[in-house]
A protein has these predicted regions:
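N-terminal glycine-/serine-/threonine-rich beta1-alpha1-beta2 phosphate-ribose binding loop
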Residues: 1-116, 132-144
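Predominantly a Rossmann-like dinucleotide-binding segment in NAD(P)-dependent oxidoreductases
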Residues: 27, 144-146, 151-191
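The substrate-binding groove and active-site-proximal loops of carbohydrate-active enzymes
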Residues: 45, 121, 148
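Short, solvent-exposed turn/loop segments enriched in Gly/Ser/Thr/Pro and often Arg
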Residues: 54, 76-80, 100-103, 124-126, ...
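A short, conserved beta-strand element in the Rossmann-like catalytic core
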Residues: 86, 119, 151
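ADP-ribose/adenylate-binding Rossmann-like module
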Residues: 114-127
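Short alpha-helix within the catalytic core of nucleotide-sugar-dependent glycosyltransferases
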Residues: 129-133, 158
Length: 191
């Protein structure tokens, strides 16, 4: 599919600063708890709700929240689409999506359609069309959509970036890098 390219929008995606950022979490399996743990340490971030179809996982998220001295979040997850009820409550600024890959695009789109910024675990999409659906929804709704890629924010990566900015390598004419690990087994799970 060829994207419909045109002039850049005249308006930007700037969002007014929020005194408190109301956060929701979909998925408390492998990656969700690490995002929750990080948010619980940030002043001005409030954990409002957690959704997971696996009851022990959502209860674990609630326990993490109260153990950090924060109010217990509202829990969702009675069925695979209960996340929509959470989004429909209208009390979230941002939602972290840490679910199986095939849910990333529909959940991200549903969040942005409801005025909620979507922070999506990697990969944000598993098809090019899925990528474009996220981009187009973000542009249309003026809600941010961020893929939660962490590799480019590691100590080594930021050190190299700083060295480039300081001119340690001279004038850079071309750069190339890769981060590769075998994920074919995960792709088979969603086929």
């Amino acid at each position: 599919r060829t994207p419909k390219l045109g002039p850049m929008p005249k308006d930007d995606f700037a969002v007014a600063p929020l005194k408190t950022v109301r956060c929701g979490f979909i998925g408390m399996g492998a990656r969700g708890p690490s995002h929750l743990s990080a948010i619980l340490k940030i002043e001005g971030a409030e954990v409002v709700s957690i959704c997971d179809t696996h009851q022990p996982s959502r209860e674990k998220g609630a326990a993490m929240t109260t153990k950090a001295g924060k109010p217990a979040p509202k829990l969702y997850g009675t069925d695979p689409y209960d996340y929509r009820r959470m989004l429909d409550e209208g009390n979230l600024d941002v939602v972290f999506i840490s679910t199986p890959w095939e849910w990333h695009v529909p959940m991200g789109v549903d969040a942005m359609e409801r005025g909620v910024h979507a922070l999506i675990e990697v990969p944000a999409a598993i098809t090019v069309d899925g990528c474009w659906e996220l981009v187009e929804t973000s542009e249309r709704t003026k809600r941010h959509c961020m893929m939660l890629e962490n590799v480019n924010y590691g100590r080594e990566e930021l050190a190299v970036l700083n060295m480039c900015r300081l001119g340690v390598f001279g004038e850079l004419l071309h750069g190339e890098a890769a981060y590769i690990h075998d994920l074919r087994w995960q792709m088979k799970e969603i086929e």
